[in-house]
């Protein structure tokens, strides 16, 4: 593993991993800011900003942003999560300077045109509608809302139709200047990349990034509350999600929770899959998961079942949770470790995953 890290004088961190056997490079900018960093009135603005970054700069139109990267066979995209936002590209090695230029351009010189903003709001309203029509999206949103009631960490990343429609270009700029600063950003590349050359390109193109926020970034400490939510819909399946507070990703017990989630519902040999599906036939899909955030976590079990099987399903899941607190066999731990290790290593076999 040939990983190099440089912290620029501006505070921006640049990390590369040279993979000389490849012909491509995956690169991107990761910002320690997501939906959790919004104020009450900004619900959904982090995600809207991610969309608007591709809608034109002082140098490029929205179409030019798409065409320039695709003209060389590359691709560019972005994603918003609860605590981070990322803008990334994948190109052949000779086109890295172009990708760096485009990423820097959209992050430092976007115009946030009002007409483009109104069009993109409409796109996001459709995205919100699509999520509301997807039962498993709905159950996870309701679960998060109950787990962290009244807190930004528990809110949907997409926002609501009301908040999305209310945003102006000035509000987007205010969020940007408060959160997109060099001390909160990492520029990363993996593939056939020379570290020193990449650092020089980043230093030149990202020079105009602010080094200090315009105001103190928002992120209140998480308080797990828990609760119950039920929503009746005319569907064939019933979506069920049971859970409790887990561990933050920097805690040692985070990895124990990952192993427990795998033992309970990480594959076809897991306890829940065997008991709930194979032996009792109560559902088609059942799995356990553990999400880690910076100061909290969520451990949960998700299943989809026919409504008539729900009264039997929930007690079985609870019983498996109880059993796991009493006895876990070494063979199960070893199998879970092997599965997690294999997933991690297999998932690192592409430059995009390593970036």
Per-region residue spans from a language model:
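Short beta-strand-initiation
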Residues: 1, 224-228, 271
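Residue-level marker for the onset of beta-strands and adjacent loop->beta junctions
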Residues: 1-2, 25, 74
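Short, Gly/Pro- and small/polar-rich lid/capping loops
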Residues: 1-10
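Charge-rich, well-structured scaffold segments of protease-associated domains
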Residues: 7, 18, 62-221, 230, ...
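Active/ligand-binding-proximal structured segments within catalytic/core domains
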Residues: 11, 18-69, 143, 180, ...
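A generic "binding-loop/recognition-motif" signal
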Residues: 12, 194, 268-269
């Amino acid at each position: 593993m040939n990983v190099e890290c440089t912290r620029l004088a501006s505070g921006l961190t640049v990390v590369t991993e040279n993979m000389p056997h490849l012909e491509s490079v995956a690169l991107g900018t990761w910002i320690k800011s997501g939906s959790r960093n919004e104020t009450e009135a900004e619900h959904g603005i982090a995600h809207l900003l991610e969309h608007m970054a591709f809608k034109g700069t002082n140098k490029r139109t929205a179409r030019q942003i798409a065409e320039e990267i695709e003209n060389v066979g590359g691709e560019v995209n972005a994603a918003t999560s609860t605590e981070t936002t990322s803008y990334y590209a994948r190109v052949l090695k000779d086109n890295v300077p172009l990708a760096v230029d485009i990423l820097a351009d959209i992050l430092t010189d976007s115009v946030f045109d009002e007409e483009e903003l109104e069009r993109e709001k409409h796109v996001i309203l459709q995205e919100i509608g699509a999520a509301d029509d997807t039962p498993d999206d709905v159950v996870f949103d309701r679960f998060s809302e109950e787990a962290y009631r009244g807190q930004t960490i528990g809110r949907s990343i997409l926002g609501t139709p009301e908040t999305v429609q209310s945003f102006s270009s000035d509000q987007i700029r205010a969020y940007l200047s408060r959160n997109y600063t060099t001390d909160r950003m990492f520029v990363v590349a993996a593939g056939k990349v020379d570290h020193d050359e990449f650092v020089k390109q980043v230093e030149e193109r990202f020079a105009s990034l602010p080094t200090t926020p315009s105001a103190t970034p928002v992120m209140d400490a998480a308080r797990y509350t828990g609760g119950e939510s039920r929503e009746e819909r005319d569907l064939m399946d019933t979506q069920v999600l049971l859970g409790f507070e887990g561990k933050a990703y920097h805690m040692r017990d985070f990895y124990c929770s990952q192993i427990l989630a795998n033992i309970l519902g990480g594959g076809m040999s897991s306890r829940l899959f065997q008991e709930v599906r194979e032996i009792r036939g109560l559902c088609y899909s059942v799995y356990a998961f553990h999400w880690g955030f910076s100061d909290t976590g969520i451990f949960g079990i998700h299943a989809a079942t026919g409504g008539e099987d729900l009264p039997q399903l929930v007690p079985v899941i609870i019983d498996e949770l109880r059993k796991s607190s009493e006895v876990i066999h070494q063979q199960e731990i070893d199998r879970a470790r092997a599965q997690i290790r294999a997933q991690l290593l297999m998932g690192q076999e592409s430059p995009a995953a390593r970036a």
